[in-house]
């Protein structure tokens, strides 16, 4: 099974070697047929502490690194 890759915005970089990334998804509400936005926050591994708040990054699923962390930052978008 291929690893999932998600795109989001870094909302916290206070932890050592970890960033918190907010990933937003959009979908049509089943009853109202209105576009709804929902977001979820993921902890991702950042080995070199190079990503800062506001950066748009891609994260990739990986083996669990800690209790809450099973994603790693792959790259940043320009």
Curated annotation (Swiss-Prot):
<comment type="subunit">
    <text>Part of the 30S ribosomal subunit.</text>
</comment>
<protein>
    <recommendedName>
        <fullName>Small ribosomal subunit protein uS17</fullName>
    </recommendedName>
</protein>
<keyword id="KW-0687">Ribonucleoprotein</keyword>
<dbReference type="GO" id="GO:0022627">
    <property type="term" value="C:cytosolic small ribosomal subunit"/>
</dbReference>
<comment type="function">
    <text>One of the primary rRNA binding proteins, it binds specifically to the 5'-end of 16S ribosomal RNA.</text>
</comment>
<keyword id="KW-0694">RNA-binding</keyword>
<dbReference type="Pfam" id="PF00366">
    <property type="entry name" value="Ribosomal_S17"/>
</dbReference>
<dbReference type="InterPro" id="IPR019984">
    <property type="entry name" value="Ribosomal_uS17_bact/chlr"/>
</dbReference>
<keyword id="KW-0699">rRNA-binding</keyword>
<dbReference type="GO" id="GO:0019843">
    <property type="term" value="F:rRNA binding"/>
</dbReference>
<keyword id="KW-0689">Ribosomal protein</keyword>
<dbReference type="InterPro" id="IPR000266">
    <property type="entry name" value="Ribosomal_uS17"/>
</dbReference>
<dbReference type="GO" id="GO:0003735">
    <property type="term" value="F:structural constituent of ribosome"/>
</dbReference>
<comment type="similarity">
    <text>Belongs to the universal ribosomal protein uS17 family.</text>
</comment>
<dbReference type="InterPro" id="IPR012340">
    <property type="entry name" value="NA-bd_OB-fold"/>
</dbReference>
<dbReference type="GO" id="GO:0006412">
    <property type="term" value="P:translation"/>
</dbReference>
